[in-house]
Structure formats: structure tokens, C-alpha cells
Amino acid sequence: MPHAHPADIDGHHLTPDTVAAIARGQRAAIVPEPVLGKVADARARFEQVAAANVPIYGVSTGFGELVHNWVDIEHGRALQENLLRSHCAGVGPLFSRDEVRAMMVARANALARGYSAVRPAVIEQLLKYLEAGITPAVPQVGSLGASGDLAPLSHVAITLIGEGKVLTEDGGTAPTAEVLRERGITPLALAYKEGLALINGTSAMTGVSCLLLETLRAQVQQAEIIAALALEGLSASADAFMAHGHDIAKPHPGQIRSAANMRALLADSARLSGHGELSAEMKTRAGEAKNTGTGVFIQKAYTLRCIPQVLGAVRDTLDHCATVVERELNSSNDNPLFFEDGELFHGGNFHGQQVAFAMDFLAIAATQLGVVSERRLNRLLSPHLNNNLPAFLAAANEGLSCGFAGAQYPATALIAENRTICSPASIQSVPSNGDNQDVVSMGLIAARNARRILDNNQYILALELLASCQAAELAGAVEQLAPAGRAVFAFVRERVPFLSIDRYMTDDIEAMAALLRQGALVEVVRGAGIELA
């Protein structure tokens, strides 16, 4: 059900969360009348300048390396339509419906600032499509990230004039013209500058990035939830999350929030050993000896102890990336731009380097989130590390039964895959367009890489979650779990039974990964009275 209050597309106050909500159909979008008035005024002033027959890029000139060609303004519509048709050359699988809708919202917001000098009708057509559920079919491959996301945005823009293809409800595509006829929607007739303004910007990478920020936010919370359950399965310690060590000693905001979450998730657990208890046990075992092994570890391995330092750093990275994306979202990333004082700016605001860097950074952070999860999974399964639990958490007939041995392999493989994918796309500039575009950002590639890593992580986390539940049950410790842990355990067991004998596991893993994609564990612990930061 859509949010009661539509979101304003005003060019200045849009947030990534709001873009995600509109993209997912949870909220409607409107352009306030004063904004449309400002856009109309800007267009009128721009038309006065253009009428003076002065050279304006993309209005009275060719595009890119063809800029030296004078084009009479009488050919304005043909020039814009030719631009869209020629740049509808994307290839590969299509972006999802939500991703394309996010692109459309981002582009509408950039145009709503007024500096791109389009008519209000252009923005209104984008919003009309959003409201009607008409979503362009946009191939994923083809953007260089400067001049913006030309190829994917061309596949969006071409549908506004009744050409190209749109997505159907069954996941296929249909000619835009047919769909518009069925809906009674009139195609837009472009005027000069408007085709260029629709595609010459960063709205594809920015729109996709808005969704990725939301995904990582839920993922880091669920990583903390699963880590807490793994700690209980291994009978570890919560002392490493003491507030003093974070709030006072190392006050990175993300680390502080992560440590607070771990304290909340582990509160009232009877499965954990404190530093005082471990110290006393060490002294008892040592007796009068001055140098002797006791078998008591008063500190645990880093994957159990440094959760706030690692996941907190992921949180801080997420915050930084969100700042960059929100700033880009509310920017005029077009060329040329036209200002209230009559100045024309021929520049390069279409360059997506900021978003490209941010998405590469997000990909690196997400990769490390997966790494620490996989290492805890290894600790749960290894008979040398799992606190005397059965090897590979096999419930019976160790040796005859393999337990979770095979389930570790996809997690290990996905870590290697993530490490390969997270190599920065933002440094992979390849000159193009007759060396006019001689340095490009590859920002949409960076966003697509980050998306793939985040999806891989859902499987890694699902495996850690299943192993943690198995460990708690094998240890006979379910009733000793913290309230959060018991709630999560019950949620999992309602869907995936205890691994008593070896069985086909793919369906179990897929089921858990699907629930993690929905952010299900955040709601589970909320139901247990815990609101995570």
C-alpha cells in the first residue's frame, strides 16, 4: 500500500530512501506546482537565448566529437530523437523493474531543478509513467558513466516518445507504442535540448545506488543478528562489546552503533562467558604453577571479538556513500546548464566519478562483511575451533554423515567471487567517442558490481545463520539463548528443520537467502523488543 503522503520531486530534498520507496511502489511521487512553474520559467528564458541563434551544445550543434557541426534549430526535434535512437544500443540482461523506476525518479528530480531547461511536460511524462506502472526495458550493459549514463537513459527516454520497449507484467517486453495506446497515453513530442537533458546525466547509476544503500543497511543489521547467534552457538563472550571500549575509547559512529546492537542482541543470554568468569577459571586451572597452559582463552578470535570494528566500518562506509549519492541525486548532472542570470554553463557535470568511487567503496565494504561471516561459518564447522561441537555440525555418525561440510563450499566460492568483483571499476577508464570521452567513470559498472556482491552475501549470511542454529541445538543451548537469539532460532526452525541426517540443502539455503533479501531478521528481533540502530 503506497504511503499516504506523496513524495515531492523538487530537485533539492529527495533522499535515497524515498527513491527506493517510490521505486518499489510504496510511495507516490508528485512535482509541486511552484517547482513546475520554476521549470517553465527557466525554459522560457532559455528559448529566448536559443532564438538568438547562438551556438549551444546539443541544441544548435552535433553531439560529442560531432560538436563542431552546426545544426539549425529548426531541426531541434529530429536532432533529439536521433540522439535517443542512436544511443539505444545497450546489451545484455535487463535491469529490474525497481531499478529502472529508481532511474526515472532520479532523472525527474535532476530535471526539476530547472537548470536543464526542459519543459514541465518532460518531467510530467516521467511521473505519469511511474504512476501508471509503465517501466522501460533497459539493458544493463552500455554505460561508461560519462557523459552520464547515455545508453540506459536513452532506453528510458525513448519510451517517453512512444518508441522502444517496456516491461510487461509477466517479465517480458512489449512495444511502447502498443502499451501507450492501450493506456490512452499520448507520446511526448520532444523540443530542442530535451533528449539530451534526459540522457546526459548520472541518474542510472544514482538510481541503482539508492536501492543498494537500502540493501546494505538491512544486510549489516542482519549480519549483526546472525553474528550474535553464532557467538551464542560457540559459547563466546560479549565483553568485547562493552560500551566503554567503543563509546569512549574509539568513537567511530558506526562502531558505536554496532557494539550497541551486539549488546542488545546478546542481553540476558546464558550462553556467554564473561572476562571475570574466564579469568577465575584460568587462575583455578593454573593453580600454583608459574608457567602452564590452562586451555582457557580469555580473548576470542577476531571474527568473534572485532564485530563492531568491522561491521561498524561497513556502517561508516555506508553513511559516506549515502551522503555522496544523496548529493548527486539533488544535483544538476547535465550539460549544458542554464542559470537564472542567463549564463550558459558548458561543462562536465554528467561525469559520475563521485558515485563511481562511492559504489566501489560500498563494494569493498560489502565484501569484507561477507568475509567475516564466512570465517565465523568456518569456525562453527571446524572441529579444531568450534568449542567441542561435532565436526561440520554433523548430528550423528560423524564420518558416515558430512553435516554442513558441503554447505561451506558455496560460501568459500562466493568470497573468492566477491574479492574478484570488488576490484575498482572507477579506475577502469577507457577512452571513447573519438577521444572526446577520454576519461570516464564506469559508475554504473561499479554499482552493478556492488549489487552482485550484496546478493552473494545473502547466501553467505544464510549459511552462517543455518550453521548457528544447528550449533545451538547440538549444544543443547536453545533455552539459554538471549531473547533475540531464541526469536531468530524459532523463525528459522519454522522454515528449515534441524539437520539430523544428511539431506539436499540447496532449498534450505535458497529459502533463508530469500528471507534475508526481504530484511526478515530485522523484523524478527523487532518483534522480540529490540530496535537495531
Curated annotation (Swiss-Prot):
Annotated GO MF terms: ammonia-lyase activity; L-tyrosine 2,3-aminomutase activity; tyrosine ammonia-lyase activity
Segments crossing the lipid bilayer: none
Keyword Lyase set for record: yes
PROSITE patterns: PAL_HISTIDASE
Keywords: Isomerase, Lyase
Pfam families in the cross-refs: Lyase_aromatic (PF00221)
EC number: 4.3.1.23, 5.4.3.6
Cross-link 5-imidazolinone (Ala-Gly), sequence positions: A146-G148
Post-translational modification summary for this protein: Contains an active site 4-methylidene-imidazol-5-one (MIO), which is formed autocatalytically by cyclization and dehydration of residues Ala-Ser-Gly.
Entry-annotated residues carrying 2,3-didehydroalanine (Ser): S147
Ligand binding (substrate): H87, N200, R305
Domain of life assignment: Bacteria
Keyword Lyase: yes
Active site: Y57 (proton donor/acceptor)
Database matches in InterPro entries: Aromatic_Lyase (IPR001106), Fumarase/histidase_N (IPR024083), L-Aspartase-like (IPR008948), Phe/His_NH3-lyase_AS (IPR022313), Tyr_aminomutase (IPR022314)
Catalytic activity field: L-tyrosine = (E)-4-coumarate + NH4(+); L-tyrosine = 3-amino-3-(4-hydroxyphenyl)propanoate
Similarity-based family: Belongs to the TAL/TAM family.
Biological function: Has ammonia-lyase and, to a lesser extent, aminomutase activity. Catalyzes the rearrangement of L-tyrosine to R-beta-tyrosine and S-beta-tyrosine. Does not accept L-histidine or L-phenylalanine as substrates.
Self-association and partners: Homotetramer; dimer of dimers.
UniProt protein name: Tyrosine ammonia-lyase
Species this protein is from: Cupriavidus metallidurans (strain ATCC 43123 / DSM 2839 / NBRC 102507 / CH34)
